[in-house]
Regions:
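Alpha-helix N-cap and loop-to-helix initiation/capping positions
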Residues: 19-22, 74-84, 146-150, 181-189, ...
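Substrate-binding cleft/loops of secretory-pathway carbohydrate-active enzymes
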Residues: 103-134, 181-189, 214-223, 334-337, ...
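Structured mid-domain segments that build the active-site/substrate or prosthetic-cofactor binding neighborhood
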Residues: 22-25, 33, 145-264, 281, ...
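Gly/Pro-rich turn-and-neighbor structural signature
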Residues: 13-15, 20-162, 172
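A structural motif corresponding to the C-terminal end of an alpha-helix
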Residues: 85-100, 157-168, 197-203, 304, ...
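Glycine-rich, aromatic-flanked loop segments that form ligand/cofactor-binding clefts
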Residues: 1-10, 46, 101, 208
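Catalytic domains of carbohydrate-active enzymes that cleave complex glycans
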Residues: 201, 228-412
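Aromatic-lined carbohydrate-binding/catalytic grooves of carbohydrate-active enzymes
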Residues: 1-11, 62-64, 168-179, 214
């Protein structure tokens, strides 16, 4: 709700009060209007009209009025009041238009199931593997990895929802957002997570993979996720064969082979590191650094990866393929230069410094030529709201500074 009269007692998050009868009535009226508007436009219940979504604003600043706090104390979480409101809307909808669901996000403050309130039969729960009590979902480890504290906690909450309701869907986030100068090695987790989710009692998966402006491999994620959604029984070998097919299509037969080899090396570097990291919030607390990959592995293989890049350039089939190769491997140069900067440039021999300077200039020129996105910044618009815009490289080249120190800006 945009009108200030609907806000709860914590206005910084623009959350409404979920126990306010006027707000609940407005939401009841909205779901009826939404269905009737669809029918008037020629849509059909059960076909175009299946689910009406209800979701709180994207923050955890819930109302703290006496009624909301009473529900919180009884149910043990903010989910109680939101689910009670959702049930009210669902009850009205079930009477007027049977067969239409109301979907509630279990997300950022509403991920924990309430103690006593249960969703009605026509309520769907969209569980988001995203954030729980300040902990972000970990992309390095699999959703059901019991040795990953964050994922273990979120998976436990997810299982509670599936035990509580047969109508659970999943929002899944295998994507980058802030520090996107380097690709995220998320594909091993994508394979196992999609297979795991397909084995659970859920209705569907909303797989958010960002877009190609933010991540050069966004379409690969969508392609592989679609393959798994179609057939989750495919083997790991078949999965990566589809990835190789994609690289050959996008970068050309021979150039694609080289790009694919580098792609698999990044996955290996992440497996070796084995540290928790949320890739879509990656860079928020550590801008310019790269904790997604093992630094020693990347440093040891920098020269080989550089050869892969130039070999791919030499066999590029077209100007378009050459441009895509440059864009993709520019991330390799950025992360490898940053990792090896102190050893090979600051403390390196004259020969090592000369090689590093040449590669550093080459990397800088590639980022400018290819308009590589470094991060996505949040820019305020007006009094309320914000817009996310891609941030490109605009600073002058400074050989005496590690690119990790100044290329990627802090998101606000």
């Amino acid at each position: 709700f945009k009108n200030d009269e609907y806000l709860g007692e914590r206005i910084e998050g623009r959350q409404p009060c979920y126990t306010n009868e006027d707000i609940i009535t407005a939401i009841e009226n909205y779901v009826i209007w939404k269905v009737e508007s669809g029918i008037a436009a020629g849509q059909r219940i059960g076909r175009e009209i299946v689910t009406i979504d209800i979701a709180q604003p994207d923050n955890a600043s819930f109302c703290t009025c006496d009624d909301c706090r009473a529900v919180f104390n009884k149910e043990g979480c903010n989910t109680g009041a939101v689910l009670m409101m959702t049930n009210r809307a669902a009850a009205v909808l079930a009477e007027a238009y049977p067969g239409v669901y109301v979907s509630m996000l279990a997300y950022h403050g509403t991920d924990a199931p309430p103690k006593t309130v249960r969703p009605l039969d026509n309520v769907r729960i969209s569980y988001c593997f995203y954030i729980s009590n300040g902990d972000f979902y970990c992309n390095t480890h699999h959703i059901d990895d019991e040795n990953c504290p964050g994922n273990f906690k979120m998976n436990r909450l997810f299982k509670k929802w599936t035990e509580m309701s047969p109508n659970v869907d999943v929002w899944y986030y295998p994507f980058q957002w802030y520090n996107v100068a380097f690709q995220d090695p998320v594909f091993d987790s994508l394979y196992y997570d999609m297979k795991y989710l397909a084995s659970q009692n859920i209705g569907g998966i909303m797989c958010l993979t960002s877009n190609s402006t933010v991540s050069l491999l966004a379409s690969l994620k969508s392609y592989l996720a679609s393959r798994l959604a179609w057939d989750a029984s495919i083997t790991e070998a078949e999965y990566y064969a589809y990835a190789l097919e994609w690289f050959r299509i996008v970068y050309g037969e021979d150039s694609g082979e080289n790009a694919y080899t580098y792609f698999r090396m990044c996955e290996t570097a992440n497996d070796i590191l084995d540290e928790c990291c949320c890739f879509f919030h990656y860079g928020e607390d550590m801008p310019g650094t790269h904790h997604m990959v093992d630094a020693k592995y990347m440093a040891d293989n920098f020269d080989f990866m550089y050869e892969l890049y130039h070999d791919a350039l030499d066999v590029a089939e077209s100007a378009g393929a050459e441009f895509r190769v440059k864009g993709y491997f520019s991330g390799m140069l950025y992360v490898c230069i940053g990792i090896t900067y102190e050893d090979r440039y600051t403390n390196g021999s004259a020969e090592e410094r000369a090689v590093m300077a040449e590669r550093y200039r080459e990397c800088y020129d590639l980022y400018v030529e290819c308009r590589r996105t470094l991060t996505v910044d949040t820019v305020p618009v007006g009094e309320h709201g914000a817009v996310d815009v891609p941030v490109y490289l605009t600073v002058p080249l400074d050989l005496e500074r590690n690119p990790f120190e100044y290329w990627v800006v802090d998101p606000i």
